[in-house]
Every structure is written in structure tokens, then in C-alpha cells.
Amino acid sequence: MSEKYVVTWDMLQIHARKLASRLMPSEQWKGIIAVSRGGLVPGALLARELGIRHVDTVCISSYDHDNQRELKVLKRAEGDGEGFIVIDDLVDTGGTAVAIREMYPKAHFVTIFAKPAGRPLVDDYVIDIPQNTWIEQPWDMGVVFVPPISGR
């Protein structure tokens, strides 16, 4: 990836609230299925904003830090997804999205970020990201002291 897009906690919350507003009325949803790990934090934010208490996970491994690898389903939520929102942080090349669509064909699949290759596979997303861009999520970064430029 040649570019990086840094996401802050407040940006993520703003984007999640925007997505939640598009998913109203919340009564139409039975629950949320968060794709682990990227969808866990956005899933919690959606659950809060929509007042949804039924939250489950589908655990899929497809990245090793910044390298994409073979998809492996570690745990899945039951059912075909009817009445559920499936949330992930990002749709990239579409590998995970294809697996999600096969497991939950009746779910409403949403992400915060979408790259061009995966965009057609989700029902809704908030932010367009160029395909060659790596997203730095706030949960992957630490807060560090940065000394003043003057050095004083």
C-alpha cells in the first residue's frame, strides 16, 4: 500500500453515527453481527446509537497486521442474517465480503470505509477510500508524546 489514511477515535464515532442514522428506524433490526476484529468497535458504536442489545460476532481471519492472507472462518453467528446488520470496518478487495454474503445472504451488510474493489458487495458505507490506501484504525495506534518543534 502506498498511502495511509489515519482514523481518529472522534472521526470513527462521527462516521458510525452517520451510518446509524441511515439504518433507522432501529426497530427493523433483530440485532447486529460484528465481523471480528475490525467490526467490533464499529458494531459497539452502532449498537449504542440504535439501541440494539443483541450483538453477535462472526470471526474471520484474513489479515496478519498489514498483509492479506487466506480467509479462515473461526466462529460464525447462526442463521441466514435475516433482520440483522452485519458490520465490518472496511470492505477492501471483497474477499471477506464474499464470505459474509454467502454466510448471511439476507443480512444488511455495512462498513464504515469502502475501497473500489469491494464497494459493490456492501449495502451501505460512509467513506470512500482509494484502493492503494492502508487504513490506520485508532485501536491499532497508541497515544504518544510528541516533543515541540522548537525543542524547548
Curated annotation (Swiss-Prot):
Catalytic reaction annotation: GMP + diphosphate = guanine + 5-phospho-alpha-D-ribose 1-diphosphate; XMP + diphosphate = xanthine + 5-phospho-alpha-D-ribose 1-diphosphate; IMP + diphosphate = hypoxanthine + 5-phospho-alpha-D-ribose 1-diphosphate
Domain of life: Bacteria
Positions annotated to bind xanthine: 92, 135
Known pathway: Purine metabolism; GMP biosynthesis via salvage pathway; GMP from guanine: step 1/1; Purine metabolism; XMP biosynthesis via salvage pathway; XMP from xanthine: step 1/1
Membrane topology: Peripheral membrane protein
Binding-site list for 5-phospho-alpha-D-ribose 1-diphosphate: 37-38, 69, 88-96
Keywords carried by this UniProt record: Cell inner membrane, Cell membrane, Glycosyltransferase, Magnesium, Membrane, Metal-binding, Purine salvage, Transferase
Needed cofactors: Mg(2+)
Residues that coordinate or bind guanine: 92, 135
Uppermost EC category: transferase
E.C. numbers: 2.4.2.-, 2.4.2.22
Any one GO biological process: purine ribonucleoside salvage
Ligand binding (Mg(2+)): 89
Residue sites binding GMP per the record: 69, 92-96, 134-135
Gene Ontology CC entries for this record: cytosol; plasma membrane
Magnesium found in the keyword field: yes
GO terms assigned for molecular function: guanine phosphoribosyltransferase activity; hypoxanthine phosphoribosyltransferase activity; magnesium ion binding; xanthine phosphoribosyltransferase activity
Subunit-level organization: Homotetramer.
Similarity comment text for this entry: Belongs to the purine/pyrimidine phosphoribosyltransferase family. XGPT subfamily.
Entry function: Acts on guanine, xanthine and to a lesser extent hypoxanthine. Purine salvage pathway enzyme that catalyzes the transfer of the ribosyl-5-phosphate group from 5-phospho-alpha-D-ribose 1-diphosphate (PRPP) to the N9 position of the 6-oxopurines guanine and xanthine to form the corresponding ribonucleotides GMP (guanosine 5'-monophosphate) and XMP (xanthosine 5'-monophosphate), with the release of PPi. To a lesser extent, also acts on hypoxanthine.
Protein name (Swiss-Prot/TrEMBL): Xanthine-guanine phosphoribosyltransferase
Gene that specifies this protein: gpt
